[in-house]
């Protein structure tokens, strides 16, 4: 089985099947798919905005027609578990991640757009 066949099989799976697969992989290889995520502080006041913005929020405006690919991209980029990443995608429009540097935000935007989502930087 090659990589494309594996990806195709994963795309065909339901969310429940994906969750079980992740749990089985975690158990078999002794790893955790969930990475710690730092929570950004509250939004700064409007009067505190600098000339050039140094922190950006990645805003998921629309998930497009490829929901599973967008969920996978959100998981990969944020380190969230499957359930949490699905929640972020299901709650769109909304922020995926806040307080990122310009480079990190643009990289995240690019990867989410490759997955089929419409993304804005705020």
From Swiss-Prot:
Biased composition (Basic and acidic residues): 99-114
Region (Disordered): 94-122
GO CC list: cytosolic large ribosomal subunit
UniProt superkingdom: Bacteria
Keyword DNA-binding applies: no
Keywords: Ribonucleoprotein, Ribosomal protein
Record-linked CDD domains: Ribosomal_L7_L12
MF terms in GO: mRNA binding; structural constituent of ribosome
GO biological process, one term: translation
Protein's job: Forms part of the ribosomal stalk which helps the ribosome interact with GTP-bound translation factors. Is thus essential for accurate translation.
Subunit structure: Homodimer. Part of the ribosomal stalk of the 50S ribosomal subunit. Forms a multimeric L10(L12)X complex, where L10 forms an elongated spine to which 2 to 4 L12 dimers bind in a sequential fashion. Binds GTP-bound translation factors.
Family listed: Belongs to the bacterial ribosomal protein bL12 family.
Record's protein name: Large ribosomal subunit protein bL12
Organism encoding this protein: Halanaerobium praevalens
Lineage: Bacteria, Bacillati, Bacillota, Clostridia, Halanaerobiales
Gene expressing this chain: rplL
């Amino acid at each position: 089985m090659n990589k494309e066949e594996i990806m195709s099989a994963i795309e065909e799976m339901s969310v429940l099947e994906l969750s079980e697969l992740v749990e089985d992989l975690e158990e078999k290889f002794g790893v955790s798919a969930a990475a710690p995520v730092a929570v950004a502080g509250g939004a700064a006041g409007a009067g505190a905005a600098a000339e050039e913005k140094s922190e950006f929020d990645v805003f998921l405006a629309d998930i497009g027609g490829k929901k599973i690919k967008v969920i996978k991209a959100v998981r990969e980029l944020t380190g969230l578990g499957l359930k949490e990443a699905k929640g972020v995608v299901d709650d769109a429009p909304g922020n995926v991640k806040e307080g990122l540097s310009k480079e990190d935000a643009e990289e995240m935007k690019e990867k989410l757009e490759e997955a089929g989502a419409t993304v804005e930087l705020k």
